[in-house]
Structures are given as structure tokens and as C-alpha cells.
């Protein structure tokens, strides 16, 4: 398939829950469309975290990818940094006449790319924070409500540090109002992969077995031996948290598999909930059946959203 001239979209997005086959579909479409893949995965940015994050780099072949293996484990990375690097990658790819394909399942990253609003990385203002030492919690809450009049019973008001951080962000955003660069003219076409629940559960379980057999435990051990503390590995998600517990003799091998498998199933449900919320917030997702030939269905969606085809239609 070869789409030419002026498609209605200039960003193709492939999303879906874990183990749904996103990477394979994105790679196949990138080959056909002359595209490059931008990862929307919060953990694949880190080097040497390959098996636990499901990078599947062998599937990419000659297809160029972005935002994978760009940081050392332990370095900070945020949704704000993702949005900045995502926009840089889009500009680079489009500037070379190629099509960017966003692929991943991290909901916050997908939102940051698709909902077309600029995000600010808000630094801590230590001098301003010091000035609040004598300010009572009630006064802090009152100041926050001045920035956010509709705020009622928010979790931001439960803890003093959360209130201070929320107020810090609100002040920063107010100071930056009107200073934003315009968001690029992105016209995304979003394709989601959907599976029957029982089949997705089977795929998740089988993939976990394969990862454990392929050296995931050894990968986590090497990361810890290389200086990444257990607390940081816990932060990097389910696979690293549960394998770390196993390596610290807090779980048996059988419990590792059973508990991690159950946790990943629950995670997939949360991803699906996030995707439904994206739809309610105005993101149009074209769903294809993972078990019914997703590549052919995706081709049809793409052709339906293209002005001109190489066949001359």
C-alpha cells in the first residue's frame, strides 16, 4: 500500500493494551507508508531495560525508531519531557518527508501527544516555598482556590505538600498564560487494537512465560548489580517490582509468576479504561480486531482517511 500526496492525517497512532501486538502492527505500517516510529512508552526510554519493558527491538528491522534507549536507568523522565521530545521527533520526521507513527500504551503520553495542549515542566521555586513556612494550611487552600475557583474536596487539599505543589503549578501556569508556542498542526489518525478479554489474558500469560524464560530475572539482577536501587526498580513498574521481590527472597518463583500475571491483567484493564476516557474526551479511535487480521483492517482505515492513492483514485 502506498499513500501519496495529501492525506487527511499527518500522524498515525497505534495504541492498545499490553500484549495486543502494537509494535508489530506499527512496524508493518511504517514499512508500507515510509514511516518512522515514535515510542509512547514511559519505560522504553531507558537503556538495558529491554525484556521487562517489551521493547521487541528485533521486530523493527530497518524501521527507524525514536524515544527508545535514550536515557540511563535512574535518570528522570516525565510526561513534559516526553511531549517536548515527541514534538521534536515529529518535526524531524516530517521535515524529511516521512510519516511519524506514534506507538504505545502509556495513557498520559498518548494524551500529551494527541490532545494538542502544551505542557510545562514546572520547576520547584525554593525561595517561594521558604516564604510559605509561616502560612497556615487554610490560607494555602484559600490561595489555591483563587487560582482554581471550582476546586472543592480535592486531594490537592488533603496534604500540605500536595497543596503547596498544586499552588506552585497554578502560579507558574498563570505566569505563562499567553506565552505558549502554538501546538503544531497535527492531524492524527488513531488506530486501536482490541482483543476478546479471554484471548488477551491468554496472550499476556504466554508473553510473561516467554519473558521469564528469555532472561527477565537476570536483566533485573544486572540492573541492581549495576547500581540501580531496588526502590527505583520498583518505580519502573510491575515486572521490575515483582522480580525484585523475588530476588530479595520475598516471593517464591511460583508466587512471582502468579502475582505478576494477575497484576499485568489488572494493568491491561486500566489501560482499556484510559482509552475509553480518551474517547469521551474527543479522541477518535478506530478499533481493529486483534484476532481478525489487524493489518488489513488498519489498511482499510488508512485508505478511508487518504485523499489520494498511488493508484490514482
UniProtKB/Swiss-Prot annotation:
The UniProt record lists the keyword Lyase: no
Binding site for ATP: 16-23
Keyword set, alphabetical order: ATP-binding, Magnesium, Nucleotide-binding, Transferase, tRNA processing
Keyword Methyltransferase: no
Annotated substrate binding sites: 18-23
Subunit and partners: Monomer.
Family: Belongs to the IPP transferase family.
Name of this chain's protein: tRNA dimethylallyltransferase 2
Organism: Pelobacter propionicus (strain DSM 2379 / NBRC 103807 / OttBd1)
Amino acid at each position: 500500500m502506498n499513500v501519496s500526496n495529501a492525506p487527511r492525517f499527518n500522524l498515525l497512532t497505534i495504541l492498545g493494551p499490553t500484549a495486543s501486538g502494537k509494535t508489530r502492527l506499527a512496524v508493518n505500517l511504517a514499512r508500507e507508508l515510509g514511516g518512522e516510529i515514535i515510542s509512547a512508552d514511559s519505560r522504553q526510554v531507558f537503556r538495558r531495560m529491554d525484556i521487562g519493558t517489551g521493547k521487541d527491538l528485533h521486530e523493527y528491522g530497518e524501521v527507524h525508531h525514536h524515544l527508545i534507549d535514550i536515557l540511563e536507568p535512574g535518570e528522570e523522565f516525565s510526561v513534559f519531557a516526553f511531549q517536548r521530545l515527541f514534538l521534536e521527533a515529529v518535526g524531524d520526521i516530517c521535515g524529511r518527508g516521512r510519516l511519524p507513527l506514534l506507538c504505545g500504551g502509556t495513557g498520559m503520553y498518548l494524551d500529551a501527544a494527541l490532545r494538542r495542549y502544551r505542557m510545562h515542566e514546572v520547576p520547584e521555586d525554593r525561595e517561594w516555598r521558604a516564604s510559605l513556612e509561616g502560612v497556615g494550611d487554610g490560607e494555602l487552600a484559600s490561595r489555591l482556590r483563587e487560582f482554581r475557583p471550582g476546586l472543592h474536596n480535592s486531594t490537592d487539599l488533603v496534604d500540605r505538600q500536595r497543596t503547596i505543589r498544586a499552588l506552585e503549578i497554578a502560579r507558574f501556569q498563570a505566569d505563562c498564560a499567553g506565552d505558549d508556542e502554538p501546538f503544531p498542526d497535527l492531524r492524527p489518525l488513531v488506530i486501536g487494537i482490541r482483543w476478546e478479554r479471554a484471548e488477551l489474558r491468554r496472550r499476556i500469560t504466554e508473553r510473561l512465560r516467554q519473558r521469564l524464560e528469555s532472561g527477565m530475572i537476570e536483566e533485573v539482577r544486572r540492573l541492581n548489580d549495576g547500581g540501580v536501587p531496588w526502590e527505583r526498580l520498583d518505580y519502573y513498574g510491575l515486572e521490575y517490582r515483582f522480580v525484585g521481590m523475588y530476588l530479595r527472597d520475598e516471593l517464591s518463583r511460583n508466587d512471582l509468576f502468579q502475582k505478576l500475571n494477575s497484576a499485568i491483567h489488572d494493568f491491561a484493564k486500566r489501560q482499556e479504561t484510559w482509552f475509553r476516557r480518551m474517547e469521551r474526551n474527543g479522541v477518535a479511535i478506530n478499533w481493529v480486531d486483534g484476532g481478525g487480521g489487524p493489518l488489513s483492517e488498519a489498511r482499510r482505515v488508512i485508505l478511508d482517511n487518504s485523499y489520494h492513492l498511488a493508484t490514482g483514485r
